[in-house]
Regions:
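Amphipathic alpha-helical binding modules
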Residues: 52-91
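Amphipathic alpha-helical packing elements
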Residues: 3-54
Length: 91
């Protein structure tokens, strides 16, 4: 499942880069966990928010039903809080 998450993240970031969003790629789950457990949003988060494309953020992927088991409650809550604070609406 971790591999599927990383593939989905790479695909989302490829789309984000095509939109002109500058992202420093995270290529392993340790890096993903570090970002989600930290106090800062993932790279490109605010640029994606400005473009109405938070669906391409690491945070949005982390709270998708198929990936939630990969993350601690704290990480999932951090991701959800960041998204909601930025005005993200779930489809």
């Amino acid at each position: 499942m971790e591999e599927k998450f990383l593939e989905a993240l790479a695909a989302a970031w490829e789309k984000a880069v095509a939109l002109g969003v500058r992202i420093r790629p995270v290529t392993d789950m340790a890096g993903v966990h570090r970002v989600l457990s930290g106090h800062r949003e993932s790279d490109g988060f605010f640029q994606l928010a400005d473009q109405g494309r938070l669906d391409l953020s690491m945070e949005a992927l982390a709270v998708k039903k198929q990936f939630t088991m990969l993350f601690s409650d704290e990480e999932a809550n951090n991701a959800l809080e960041r998204l909601l604070t930025a005005g993200y609406t779930f489809k």
